[in-house]
């Protein structure tokens, strides 16, 4: 299989889903260090198990939200009415605070995981649970009555991941210099759009113009689709990095980085697919 070279540029835009995989980028920039003869080398099987662990922690986070919603949130006064991409939902201040804290924790833990790889067993677990909490909030509160969109997004994500893995293992898509150049160009373009939009929104004179553009259904769909394409391409990059780790017999400690990086991208893809479905159904509701 193709190997990803160790000079891939690391880019981060932590305030949105328009971002690269920070863990995989850091892992990819490390020098190849083969395991000592008496040291366990990284293996595909253990990387798969660890990836499944992080995804399972996402489910735990989803269940945590449902439990808190039943025992705590539902008893709060539902004073907030919020419009979100064609959906209008009512919720409590406490629910919003918990969702906001989970979002901040997700951002902080992914940054710590990127810069302190040894922390991944802990930070990766917390990140995955926070993502599950946020996903559950979206599915069971924001789009209440349309919960099937969560399952539909899951089914599509499974198909996407399976398809991309087949395209990679069969060599249809290879991680070449041209591939990385296209990927980085798309990523920097999305980050540029995100920063331009943020700056424009903060300036009172341009705020109405930026809001009208970003509020346009087709513009929003186009940006979401582009972000999803980038995420899928990063999935290919993740597969290549995992090959790089295993085939170079790097120490087993790198399995945590490789598995969390893969889980990170899979969750990214799921969230973008869910966002796309929410926008489409929200538009049809109008």
Where are the model-predicted features located?
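A hydrophobic alpha-helical transmembrane-helix feature that marks the membrane cores
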Residues: 1-286
